[in-house]
Design a protein with these regions (language model features):
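Bacterial N-terminal signal peptides
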Residues: 1-10
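Patatin-like phospholipase
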Residues: 12-76, 84-388
Length: 388
């Protein structure tokens, strides 16, 4: 599907997709500089877990209530999405509102809503029984790399992170941030600390087989949970003194539930992910705090659990409030911290040019003409969405 991409004032830089991307930020970020140096630097680790990962939002709400400032965030999969939004300057309550109001079925759908189709397109929609997109190479049909290409999800993430889109060094976000993905060809963990924030979040969330891989800097990236679902070592490398680790986990099914090949395959994957997480947890110290939301056997693919997951995240964090409060700051310091965090989101970016990606001479001129009057203007997302 052709995508008209509007690139804003500062061109996106290439990401340094190596373990070196997890190195400590060279300077304190703007938000925590206002708090002074006489406090430990706090790192937040958010695990992967699909829909279960929305429990992270409840934890963030409690951290905000307790006035616990975060100096660095490392996240995997849904932890990278929630962590990326928080690092962009959103509060826990704001992320709760965003996620709770999001139409997840629509976000995971590549096709536009039927109500937006022309009459001819609606007829075509009825005529073709197979909705799966097919490719053609060398006279042979090709199946897609994932059931979901993820274009609408990427659009949603880009819209939310647009105010910080010009920031290509994740250390310069309101809170320094790292997202973890897996190189599909090598199986290596890929730590993303620069480049396009939306692409980093989207790559970390790309469950193989479900979402198409994201190509970034010449590498095919999928869900970071395969290589490092609980990126404790990544956060530690960001120069923090104390870690707050939120692990939503992957439940293992009992023998009676292991009834089909896909379920058995998922069980094997869950075992591998849990084992890697246990190795990471073994590196924690007595000063670190671990929060395990009581999610039971809730499915990673059921986004109908979002409200309950957020509530259970809050419950688990409140259960650790005595320890968390030890790292709280007073109200004046917290207000300064919030002001610095939100500053990056105040001014909308400016549109410098319009580029069609992937390029197509057939579509280029009419699409560029549809947007040319917006060049040089502050980006109005409503106007852009209506023209797309």
């Amino acid at each position: 599907m052709l995508l008209a991409a509007l690139l804003v004032s500062t061109a996106y830089g290439a990401g340094d997709e190596t373990r070196a991307a997890g190195a400590a930020p060279t300077a304190a970020n703007a938000a925590t500089q206002a708090l002074g140096a006489a406090r430990p630097r706090i790192g937040l680790v958010l695990s992967g877990g699909g829909a279960r990962g929305t429990a992270h939002i409840g934890v963030l709400k409690v951290l905000d209530e307790l006035h616990v400032p975060i100096d660095a965030i490392a996240g995997t999969s849904m932890g990278a999405v929630v962590g990326g939004l928080y690092a962009s300057g959103f509060t826990g309550k704001e992320i709760d509102s965003i996620v709770s109001s999001l139409d997840w079925q629509d976000a995971f759908r590549d096709r536009p809503p039927r109500t937006d189709l022309t009459f001819r397109r609606k007829q075509e929609d009825q005529n073709f029984l197979v909705k799966l997109p097919l490719g053609l190479r060398g006279g042979r049909f090709l199946l897609p790399r994932g059931l979901i290409q993820g274009q609408r999800l990427s659009q949603t993430l880009r819209r939310l992170t647009l105010p910080v889109a010009q920031i290509t060094n994740f250390d310069e976000l309101p809170v320094p941030f790292r997202a973890v993905a897996t190189d599909l060809e090598t199986g290596d963990s890929v730590v993303m600390g620069s480049g396009d924030l939306t692409d980093a979040m989207r790559a970390s969330l790309s469950a193989p087989g479900v979402f198409a891989p994201v190509e970034r800097d010449g590498r095919l990236l999928v869900d970071g949970g395969l290589a490092e679902n609980l990126p404790i070592d990544v956060a530690r490398m960001m120069g923090v003194d104390v870690l707050i680790v939120v692990d939503v986990g992957f439940p293992l099914r009992n023998r009676e539930a292991l009834t089909t090949a896909p379920i058995v395959s998922n069980q094997m994957l869950a075992i591998l992910i849990r084992r890697n997480g246990q190795l990471q947890r073994a590196t924690l110290t007595a000063n670190d705090i671990v929060i395990d939301p009581p999610l039971g056997e809730a499915s990673s693919f059921n986004f109908g659990i979002v409200r309950d997951a957020i509530a259970k995240g809050e419950l688990a964090a409140r259960g650790m409030s005595a320890r968390l409060s030890a790292y709280a700051v007073d109200s004046p310091a917290w207000e300064r911290y919030l002001a610095r965090r939100s500053a990056a989101r105040e001014a909308p970016p400016r549109i410098d040019y319009v580029r069609i990606d992937p390029g197509s001479e057939h579509y280029r001129e009419p699409i560029e003409a549809a947007f040319e009057d917006l060049v040089g203007q502050p980006l109005n997302q409503t106007v852009v969405a209506s023209r797309v």
